[in-house]
Amino acid sequence: MWIEGNYRRNLMDMHIDDWNPEFLSRLDVDEYVDALKDAGVQAAMVKGRPHTGLAYYPTKIGRMHAGLKGFDFFGTMVQKCHENGIAVIAYFTQIFDNWAYETHPEWRLVTEEGKGMREYRGMKNFKTGRYGIVCPNNAGYRQYVKDCLTEMNTMYDFEGMFLDMTFFPEVCYCPSCRRKYMDETGRELPRKIDWQDEEWLAYVYQRDQWIAEYAGFATSCVKAVKPQVTVEHQFSRITGSWVDGSTEDIMKAVDYAGGDYYGGFLQQTFINKYYKNVSPNLPFVYHTSRCDPELVYHTTTKTEEELLLHVITALVHNGAFLLVDAINPDGSIVPEVYHGLMKRIYDRTRQYEPYVNGNLYYDAAIWFASHAKYDPNETDIEVREKSFEPSYYMEAPVAAASVLREKNVPFEVIGTGNIWEEKAKVMILSHVARIREEEMDAIEDYLARGGNLYISGPIGNERLQKLLGLKVTGRTKHNFTYMSPTEEGAELFEGFSHVAPLTIDRYQVEAEIVDDMGLTVLATRTLPYTMTDTYEFAAIHSNPPGIYTESPCAVLKKVGESRIIWTAAPIEMSRPYMSRQVFYRMIDLLRGEAAFTSNAPKFVEVLGWNKDGTDYYAVINEQEESPVASMYDIWIDVKGKAGQKVCLLPDNREVETETVEEDTLRIHLPKLEVFHMLRLGGE
């Protein structure tokens, strides 16, 4: 497959309208391709049909962009890129298509208020008046998609396609969705959110399947003409809410995972791990903008350190990096970005490409459960009141990742499909709202193979409750609570006590013990004297503990050779350092012996992997803001490797080592600026 070894990619983002004759009047394909070649770009994503719906090639379907005056920009780019040894990924927009929206009102997505998306102004979530959104369930729109994809693949030869915007940006109540749901279920579309209602849950799952099925349809349109063309669907909305309908099932319709992100380096390392594990083939591709921090800031460029961090973080996870640049409306580019900035970065990172694509060493695996993209507390409300960024779904597992990075616990992020073969010492279910039966089958299999679980917040399946010996009875009325350690839990809850319990600034799940065999209560629930929003209070500035209960809020359960820890709320989301330490101790207890250890500071990530029998380590300084401060005196301890030579790549410069604790190799790193890559047993 052409993607193998193809790590350096580029997209010139150009969703440009054509009402002004100035728009795209200064396009210069030769200048652009020359810039890409000089920078060392291996693949160019080229716009074929953007969000405007105005084709950048002579089309018989819809309309061509007037500013091109008949010039085949797309076809010329394909030709020039191939002449210069650059692969081409054809860009095609889906669902976001202004031409389709305006020309075919019957195709439009219809909100719960009965409006099309361009009827809104100045609102978030694409309700700005700019984006024309159509419904993927509409048969007429699907025929249009098929015709467009057939046309592009018939007219041109390219290596891959990026099918963008594979998600619902809103809940759709158009006639097509209403009819489809009625045909499939015999019911009208629901308009009230209730996460305790099986019909509502079934509807949300149905929408997930609609998007996955649509993705499969679009992919089949490409493969029917050019089976060898790779397909990448937009997968960044996996981090969004249930509204998107974007789940891991989309991976059935792609050749590799990819999507654009703008959330910083902790988010990137989390997503890169997830993509690496769910992608059908590698490398996956991580997109982010040249603009700082995102495309809205059209003229502001990220620092060289920041872009270097993006590229190397993707690379060590065996991911390609795609720079999303922003073309000026007149079609001109900023060539210095390529002849200077990106050339320097790619010249440096390409030296490390031969050493990646190994098997990561890790102790913990965070399960990112894409079928549970909701906050169970956001219930019994109208659909129009929904949140587009639900608490917990993304926040909780990323918070867990933050603590693991801080404490130098090597970790992975996995999808549902990975659980069946998961070998992590501990799997983390960080506030997973719901676990499907087939997912529970995989979890039970993992436990039967000796794996351990950490679960926080909801116990999302009755079978899991039974394994724990607990029965969930509800949720605290208090939204500010405490965990009081028992004698058995005192070591894990070090720093907290009955008098000074661990603060939880949120609700707790309530559960009662129904089977105490092999169960140890680590902490019990404590509540403030009053609610947080009442006239009465104990202390005017705070909510001190006052109501002590015997109700369990942290337990350790032994199940065969495996152990499960459950906490009634995600301690990993706590801000105080002492509280995060409790989460770390729980993970450390469950994982046992570490794959490797380090004293690296909290924002420095150490990754280790084995490729073809050789061990490698990368140390990445993932500070979120430039300038990146240099770090000193970092060491890595690797058990069983004493006496091995360690070289700093790419120049094979030997680094200082020593033997500690008999068979442990301690690697002393030189000054860390942005990153280091090391090889054990150097040439």
Task: Write out the residue ranges for each language-model feature.
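Carbohydrate-binding surfaces of carbohydrate-active enzymes
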Residues: 4-6, 35, 77-80, 88-92, ...
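Aromatic- and glycine-enriched glycan-recognition loops and surfaces
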Residues: 20-39, 60-84, 143, 213-214, ...
